[in-house]
């Protein structure tokens, strides 16, 4: 409020002088009216801000730092991500750090470890982390013999919280992040683990749609710090030294990678949201709530496990009610049972409130993004389910840039061509009474899905 007083100093002085001329019998009500006027002005001032500046302010209050010197290159499909990342690793000179939920024991992981082994021979330090539950739940896990072979090639690889009997207590607080940092100069993050189904698809769901991004700029250091903190937690080893952190500009050896061709390349505002179960457990949930509540015109949302909690449902309904165009895209296919029934139940309810819902048909859309007012977006590992919002280690890049946001919005528009729009008619044709009942039952279990 002090800033408001300073910006309206002459008017405020006039109000104060008037107050002292006011009869004592009416002075209390006069003060109340003045306070109400100031509060209204403050709210108007906040509303006049763009949703992008508001979200930055809100995230800074939660401890997120933003920098303005970043480039962000979107890697829209699996082939593009792995081609770009593998080429970057081939040019590594100092260190390669990888943190994934899982490395599926298939052709892509095999190629990755071969490339990493070659870099080790050239003196590059390679450190890799994977989650025990992610590996345990994988239909092609890394077995002890595989891990032994990888280590024999000089790659330091460790498992976070291996699953041991009784395993039921070990399903929470897992490391679901996907981070790669190369030479402390460039970083990758997004929704993909290391698996060939991001390229080949699977028999169960068909094509597997997902995306990643490459970051160059100050936020590479943030991602490096996240990795090194987890490395110490898992191994007990503290890694320090300037060589692990970025000194701009990006070395010429990485010029062969796909460039950020937008007008704001090298000038993008980016912040990294890092969710840790015991220190920042509500940060991603609060980001989504604030992003939805701050929206003034348009929300586009893609998420594979759209089970939501009550507050997120309420926020989306309120956004629709105040005239925000809300577009949601979810997949017809899924890799797990019951959860999609809950997802379909939720989007149908939101469709009836006025949301525009698209059901993606060709395969499984595993992407986790939101675009707000054409001004900011996020790419990362967090789903909109209980696991990501309440329990697991997660990480999302918040990109405050209209150009990158438009790139994602354009992708959303293209994906509409492979989707059908949910209406009451298409809902009744698609979902049998039994499936509707299963969806209702599944939504009761959403705190556990």
Give the location of each predicted region.
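Bacterial Sec-dependent N-terminal signal peptides
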Residues: 1-51
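Charged, low-complexity intrinsically disordered terminal segments
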Residues: 8, 41, 45-449
